Design a protein with these regions (language model features):
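Catalytic domains of cell-wall/extracellular-matrix polysaccharide-remodeling enzymes
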Residues: 88, 134-242, 246-247, 252-256
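Bacterial lipoprotein signal-peptidase II cleavage site
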Residues: 23-32
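C-terminal domain-boundary segment and adjacent tail
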Residues: 38-50, 55-69, 96, 109-111, ...
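Ser/Thr-centric signal marking residues that sit
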Residues: 6, 14, 76, 86, ...
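Active-site beta->alpha N-cap acidic-glycine motif
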Residues: 52-139, 143-147, 154
């Protein structure tokens, strides 16, 4: 087994600067429609679900890509938006025999609970992408934890598991504070990414394919449900990966 590259190991000396940058990082996807403001997030429940970690960790470790050398990539999707578009994404990856990881927004799961089963039934992986997709790095500790905890509890309610990964919202890399609160919520690993498809900007299928073409063995790619351009780009992306000998697998498999 090979150790995945971690931001904490490679970039520990710059985490403080990253935290400041993340608080005002431009060019990140906005919160989905219907997102709740910080004050709308209730305090965490006093009793976590049985499926959550009984032994809270210290600060989580941020994972960006794998260093295993295996010819694999992880296509990771932010779970929000029209569930019919999500189904189209799942249909395409099924046709190509690929496996993906979906970091789901809690409010989306609450509104579309069948989506969790649809994803899991396809052999894909689910993880936590906050409750309401806010600019999380700007939150104080308590509401930041509540965003992670509420989505964790919804995942556990719908699937029996809180998922293996948390991903921060509206930021490519986690801040030190986000790593601390994710650890408190029972997540040992925060899943960031080294390749951003920028599909949330709706740049068109060709631009999305060109962005993902930068992926290499071990890459974690960020993509989104809810965007028709992503669906249109996906067959070409999967074909190009196959032509390069790269297999899309879940994040857990990539980082094993």
């Amino acid at each position: 087994m090979h150790d995945p590259l971690t931001r904490r190991r490679l970039f520990g000396v710059t985490l403080g600067a990253a935290a400041l940058a993340a608080c005002s990082a431009p060019g990140q996807p906005p919160a989905p429609a219907g997102s709740t403001p910080p004050q709308a997030v209730p305090p965490p429940s006093s009793t976590p679900p049985p499926s959550s970690s009984p032994h809270p960790q210290g600060p989580a470790t941020e994972l960006v890509r794998s260093s295993s050398g295996r010819p694999q990539v992880a296509l990771t999707f932010h779970g929000a938006g029209d569930p019919q578009v999500a189904r189209q994404v799942l249909d395409v990856v099924h046709q190509h025999g690929a496996r993906i990881t979906v970091l789901a927004v809690g409010t989306w799961l609450a509104e579309h609970p069948d989506a969790a089963r649809m994803i899991r039934d396809g052999g894909h992986e689910l993880g936590n992408h906050t409750w309401s997709h806010p600019a999380l790095s700007g939150y104080a500790a308590e509401p930041m934890y509540a965003e992670i905890q509420r989505c964790r509890d919804k995942l556990a309610e719908l699937t029996g598991s809180p998922g293996n990964f948390f991903r921060q919202s509206q930021g490519q890399h986690a801040t030190p504070e986000e790593l601390v609160e994710a650890g408190k919520a029972g997540y040992a690993r925060v899943l960031s990414y080294d390749i951003d498809s920028l599909d949330w900007k709706d740049p068109g299928p060709a631009a999305i394919r060109a962005a993902v073409a930068k992926a290499r063995a071990g890459s974690v790619v960020s993509m989104h449900f809810g965007h028709p351009g992503t669906v249109a780009a996906l067959p070409g992306i999967l074909t190009a990966l196959a032509d390069r000998g790269l297999t899309p697998v879940t994040a857990s498999d990539l980082l094993a």
